[in-house]
C-alpha cells in the first residue's frame, strides 16, 4: 500500500539524495581510474592503480596555478563545470527513488546539465591558439549536438519527471516489456562511452586547482551518464519508498547500492573494450551521434507500437457487440421458433 508524502518521508528523501550525491562524487574518480587501468591491461600497458586518480586530483589541488595569456577564464569554466557536475550527481538516482509528490527533475533537465558540463570542459582548450582551438571548437560542436540527438530518448519520458518515469519502468522486465528502454539506456551509455576526451590535450593548459576541478568534473559527468543509462536500462534495481515501511525501504536501499556497484562493474568492462577502438576524433563523433540517434528512434518506435497495440482491442469488441446486438442468448419460449 502506497503511503502519502509526510515530513518523515521528505526528510528521508533529502538524506537519500545527499548520500547519493556524495557517493557518486567519491566513487567517480575511482571508477575513472579503474576503467583506465582495465583498458591498459587489455592492451598490455602498465597503468596506475584505480586510486591513483584521487591522488592526482588531490595533488593538483595543492599545487599553485600557472596562468598564461589565454588562461584567465579557465578557472571560471572549471568551477562552473564542477558545480554543475555535482548538481547532476544529486539529480540522478543511484539506489533509490524519491516519494511521489517530492520535487524531481525531468530527463531533459538532467541531460541539459550534463551537456553543459561537457561544453564547459571543452572551453579551456577552445580559447587556446592554433590547432588546439580547432580541436576544442570541434569538441564543443559535438557536445552541443548531443542534446538534439537525444530527442527520441527524451520523448520516451513524455511529460513525466525522471522519478515518475523510472517508477513506471520499475515493474517492467528488461527482456520483454522493458526491452525498448534497454535500447534507450544503451544510447545514453554511448554518450559517454564514445566521448573519450583526450585529457592530456584538453587539460594541457590547466594546472593546480583548475586542473583538479577539471578532472573531478569530467569524472562526475562520466559517472552520471553511466548511472543514468543503467537506471533507464534496468530500473528494477532502485528502491521504491512509500510502498512499504521504512525498514523495508532501507533494506531495498542496501540492495540497490550493491546492484549499482554491479552495474558499474559491467559498465567498466564495456568502456574499457570500447576505448580500444582507434578512431579519429571526427569519425568517432559521427559514430557516436549516429548510434545514439538510431538507438533512440528504434526504442521510441517500438514503445509507440506497444502503446498503440492495446488501443485496437476495444474497437474489435465494439464490432462484435454491433454484430451480436440483434441476437438474444436467452432460450425461446415453448411453441415459438428460436
Residue ranges and their predicted role:
Residues 2-338:
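Alpha-helical transmembrane segments of multi-pass membrane proteins predominantly involved
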Amino acid at each position: 500500500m502506497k503511503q502519502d508524502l509526510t515530513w518523515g518521508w521528505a526528510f528521508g528523501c533529502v538524506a537519500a539524495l545527499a548520500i547519493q550525491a556524495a557517493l557518486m562524487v567519491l566513487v567517480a574518480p575511482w571508477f575513472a581510474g579503474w576503467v583506465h587501468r582495465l583498458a591498459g591491461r587489455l592492451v598490455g600497458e602498465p597503468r596506475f592503480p584505480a586510486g591513483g586518480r584521487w591522488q592526482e586530483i588531490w595533488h593538483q589541488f595543492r599545487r599553485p596555478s600557472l596562468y598564461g595569456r589565454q588562461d584567465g577564464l579557465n578557472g571560471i569554466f572549471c568551477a562552473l563545470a564542477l558545480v554543475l557536475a555535482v548538481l547532476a550527481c544529486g539529480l540522478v538516482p543511484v539506489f533509490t527513488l524519491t516519494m511521489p509528490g517530492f520535487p524531481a527533475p525531468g530527463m531533459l533537465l538532467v541531460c541539459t546539465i550534463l551537456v553543459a558540463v561537457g561544453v564547459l570542459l571543452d572551453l579551456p582548450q577552445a580559447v587556446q591558439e592554433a590547432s588546439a582551438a580547432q580541436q576544442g571548437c570541434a569538441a564543443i560542436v559535438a557536445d552541443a549536438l548531443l542534446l538534439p540527438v537525444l530527442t527520441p530518448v527524451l520523448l520516451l519520458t513524455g511529460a513525466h519527471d525522471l522519478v515518475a518515469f523510472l517508477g513506471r519502468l520499475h515493474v517492467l522486465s528488461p527482456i520483454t516489456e522493458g526491452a525498448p528502454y534497454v535500447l534507450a539506456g544503451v544510447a545514453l551509455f554511448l554518450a559517454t562511452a564514445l566521448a573519450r576526451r583526450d585529457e592530456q590535450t584538453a587539460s594541457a593548459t590547466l594546472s593546480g586547482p583548475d586542473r583538479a576541478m577539471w578532472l573531478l568534473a569530467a569524472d562526475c559527468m562520466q559517472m552520471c551518464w553511466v548511472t543514468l543509462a543503467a537506471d533507464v536500462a534496468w530500473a528494477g534495481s532502485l528502491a521504491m519508498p512509500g510502498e512499504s515501511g521504512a525498514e523495508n525501504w532501507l533494506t531495498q536501499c542496501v540492495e540497490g547500492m550493491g546492484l549499482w556497484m554491479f552495474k558499474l562493474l559491467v559498465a567498466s568492462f564495456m568502456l574499457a573494450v570500447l576505448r580500444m577502438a582507434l578512431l579519429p576524433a571526427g569519425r568517432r563523433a559521427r559514430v557516436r551521434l549516429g548510434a545514439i540517434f538510431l538507438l533512440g528512434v528504434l526504442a521510441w518506435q517500438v514503445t509507440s507500437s506497444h502503446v498503440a497495440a492495446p488501443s485496437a482491442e476495444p474497437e474489435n469488441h465494439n464490432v462484435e457487440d454491433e454484430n451480436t446486438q440483434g441476437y438474444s442468448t436467452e432460450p425461446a419460449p415453448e411453441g415459438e421458433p428460436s
